[in-house]
């Protein structure tokens, strides 16, 4: 038969080399060559060439040939994943491009890398240039520069809650960024100034107090009073139908006889084509501090409706961490809480780069956890750790503003690479 002829031909080649004939084991599994100890060096399985493995020389050659340096000894994971889980985000962008009345919503959260302006402003700039700007998104009640030039003014009388390693759980709720203000006075006020919007949602805890919110119409402030119902839940009120212009949003506690807690604001421009990019980070936070308020995010996610949540975390954890298992559990729990509200929301886990801090646990270990979670939890991964070189090298190139945080240059570098890798899709 033809099979016999082929086998005889193979033996005619192999037998002189080994001085022995190679037996036919089965039609589907045929040894190609054995050594003196009868080890099979390679074989044919169902007619296809196969072997047990390749050595370092062939491996290196293949790595060079396919330019897959991330799978060699020094780069054992990809710089980023392939964006396949961001279907909600991609669909919203496609709707926007088709002229539909939709606003893709990007939410950036994590530690100081996401509360500070440099990275958030760079990402917002990329989105605005490509799709248009549909508003500021989230505005924290804590001080700190806003990416759009807006600001806040907080009077005396407010107590600030800021989730941190020493803060404990919030007694009166908090924002999606783990921050909140509360008061029992009747003279406190809080203003968000110089913000462009047509719509604003104010988030508060339904305690036993009274507050007012308002905005100017024709130079006269229009006020609305909220009498809280003491349910203890997080609620929100909506200001809508305002003209698309820069304005101030006011809140005050006139007539209050209980406790008022304000958690944050969300601004957008209704009817404007573009993306909303929310900056909702918390400087100093560890991953497991997200668990202080992960059970309080339903009101935010159900009303803001982010299409993708990007998390930059680990810059504090590696310096004061209790270990990577705590870090892993915190991210798993937080993502599960988000998906309980928005099952199809996309996630991007962003591993921070090497900074000039003193490590308690190697930062690379946290990067590895984030990549592993991207595989097990079906989300995306982006490694700033591998995008950047060492802190010394990147600081010399102007990418850091201090020992721990990115400069405008660093933010632009990250945003550009993130956009090409995942945001564009």
Label the model's feature ranges.
Residues 1-83, 91-102:
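Surface-exposed receptor/substrate recognition regions of extracellular proteins
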Residues 81-97, 289-301, 329-337, 364-368:
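Alpha-helical scaffolding within the catalytic cores
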Residues 101-105, 131-134, 273-276, 304-309, ...:
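Loop/turn elements at helix/coil->beta-strand transitions in domains of secreted/extracellular proteins
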Residues 106-110:
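Short hydrophobic beta-strand that contains or immediately precedes a catalytic carboxylate
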Residues 113-216, 220-329, 405-406:
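Conserved SGNH/GDSL esterase-like catalytic core that processes O-acyl groups on lipids
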Residues 116, 122-130, 300-303, 312, ...:
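Structured segments of extracytoplasmic/periplasmic soluble domains
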Residues 294, 354-425:
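Catalytic His-Asp segment of secreted/periplasmic serine-dependent ester chemistry enzymes
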Residues 310-319, 335-368:
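Active-site segments of SGNH/GDSL-like serine hydrolases
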């Amino acid at each position: 038969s033809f099979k016999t002829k082929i086998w005889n031909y193979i033996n005619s080649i192999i037998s002189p080399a080994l001085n022995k004939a190679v037996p036919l084991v089965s039609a589907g599994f045929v040894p190609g060559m054995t050594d003196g100890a009868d080890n099979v060096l390679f074989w044919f399985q169902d007619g296809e060439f196969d072997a047990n493995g390749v050595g370092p020389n062939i491996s290196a050659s293949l790595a060079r040939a396919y330019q897959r340096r991330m799978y060699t000894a020094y780069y054992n994971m990809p710089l980023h994943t392939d964006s396949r889980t961001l279907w909600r985000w991609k669909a919203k962008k496609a709707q926007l491009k088709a002229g539909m009345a939709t606003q893709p919503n990007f939410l950036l959260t994590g530690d100081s890398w996401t509360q500070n302006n440099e990275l958030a402003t760079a990402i917002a700039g990329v989105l605005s240039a490509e799709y248009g700007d549909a508003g500021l998104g989230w505005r924290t009640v804590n001080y700190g520069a806003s990416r759009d030039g807006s600001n806040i003014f907080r009077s005396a009388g407010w107590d600030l809650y800021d989730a941190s390693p020493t803060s404990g759980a919030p007694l009166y709720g908090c924002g999606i960024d783990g921050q909140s203000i509360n008061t029992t006075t009747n003279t406190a006020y809080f203003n968000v100034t110089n913000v462009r919007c047509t719509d604003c949602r104010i988030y508060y805890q339904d305690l036993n107090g009274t507050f007012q919110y308002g905005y100017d119409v024709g130079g006269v402030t229009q006020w609305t009073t909220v009498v809280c119902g003491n349910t203890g839940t997080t609620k929100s009120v909506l200001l809508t139908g305002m003209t698309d212009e820069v304005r101030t949003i006011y809140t005050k506690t006139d007539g209050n006889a209980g406790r008022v807690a304000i958690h944050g604001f969300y601004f957008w421009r209704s009817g404007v084509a573009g993306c909303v990019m929310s900056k909702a980070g918390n400087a100093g936070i560890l991953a497991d501090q997200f668990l202080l308020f992960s059970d309080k995010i339903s009101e935010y996610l159900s009303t803001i409706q982010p299409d993708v949540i990007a998390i930059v975390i680990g810059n504090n954890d590696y310096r004061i961490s209790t270990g990577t298992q705590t870090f892993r559990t915190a991210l798993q729990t937080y993502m599960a809480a988000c998906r309980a509200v928005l099952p199809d929301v996309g996630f991007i886990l962003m591993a921070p780069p090497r900074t000039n801090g003193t490590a308690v646990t190697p930062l690379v270990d946290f990067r590895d956890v984030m990549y592993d979670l991207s595989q097990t939890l079906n989300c995306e991964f982006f490694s700033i750790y591998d995008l950047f070189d060492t802190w010394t090298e990147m600081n010399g190139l102007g990418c850091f503003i201090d020992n721990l945080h990115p400069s405008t240059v660093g933010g632009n570098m990250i945003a550009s690479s993130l956009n090409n890798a995942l945001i564009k899709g």
